[in-house]
Amino acid sequence: MEIMFYHPTFDTAWWLNALAKAIPGANIREWKPGDNEPADYALVWHPPVEMLEGRKLKAVFALGAGVDSILSKLKAHPEMLDASIPLFRLEDTGMGLQMQEYAVSQVLHWFRRFDDYQALKNQSTWQPLPEYDRDEFTVGIMGAGVLGAKVAEALQAWGFPLRCWSRSRKSWPGVESFAGAEELGAFLNQTRVLINLLPNTAETVGIINSGLLNQLRDGAYLLNLARGVHVNEDDLLAALNSEKLKGAMLDVFSREPLPKESPLWQHPRVAMTPHIAAVTRPAEAVDYISRTITHLERGESVTGQVDRVRGY
């Protein structure tokens, strides 16, 4: 079995060694320009067109949960990868727990009004504030995939009303499900905390705009853990300045690194992190890849295959 590996920033030596231990008998090599030797599998992140073009691969693994970058390249260069070759994304591989940590900590931060207390502290003001009603602090999750399910599961322990919105209806215990464009308004109008975990597709680019934000409850919060292109940043700022939104926590942006001139940096009710909500955990990723390749070699069913039409 021949496996090619390419990632512009990962520790290639570590990955080659770990994969060799996890898949005994496989010949695993780093792909470099000019390498036209046969391969069965390709493990990639932002691969050059020439790496995959014309190859008769059994499968390609994107080394992350998001596949928008490789799908964009495939759209521009359809000759890069034959449509019959399955493309897989990393399923969870430690990202679920990271998303749970991030989402739960931020929802509790807002629920306990730590943002307000920080503002009072900056004014040297000692002032206890009324508590929020837990039953009125509805958390809505946009995007009901693997990570959305993990976040909903973690939030259940805290007793908040939970709802989700996605293309198709879900049957998650304790979570009210909304599906399709016709139910988006109903999903939004009682949501106090909106968590975005949507995939990056043509349909979801710019979806968080003034039209959507104005349907939320007054004084709502936005937590964006998906992609920066989902959010119209001008509309977000307008919603914050009008106090339609009370706050926003952003891990992703339409341009990264965020330009220094962006008003988001200085806005008093915007908090941010540099796209670190959930990163690839190498050991978990190697385990997932090795197990999936083993199942594929045996002709067994697997999960994690990307629908190239839907984009996730």
From Swiss-Prot:
It is found in: Cytoplasm. Its EC number is 1.1.1.79, 1.1.1.81. Pfam families: 2-Hacid_dh_C. The keyword Cytoplasm applies. It catalyses: glycolate + NADP(+) = glyoxylate + NADPH + H(+); (R)-glycerate + NAD(+) = 3-hydroxypyruvate + NADH + H(+); (R)-glycerate + NADP(+) = 3-hydroxypyruvate + NADPH + H(+). The keyword Oxidoreductase applies. Its main location: cytoplasm. InterPro entries: D-isomer_DH_CS (IPR029753), D-isomer_DH_NAD-bd (IPR006140), GhrA_Enterobacterales (IPR023514), NAD(P)-bd_dom_sf (IPR036291). One of its GO terms (molecular function) is NAD binding. GO terms for cellular component: cytoplasm. Catalyzes the NADPH-dependent reduction of glyoxylate and hydroxypyruvate into glycolate and glycerate, respectively. Belongs to the D-isomer specific 2-hydroxyacid dehydrogenase family. GhrA subfamily. PANTHER family: 2-HACID_DH_C DOMAIN-CONTAINING PROTEIN (PTHR43333), D-ISOMER SPECIFIC 2-HYDROXYACID DEHYDROGENASE NAD-BINDING DOMAIN-CONTAINING PROTEIN (PTHR43333:SF1). This is Glyoxylate/hydroxypyruvate reductase A. It comes from Citrobacter koseri (strain ATCC BAA-895 / CDC 4225-83 / SGSC4696). The gene is ghrA.
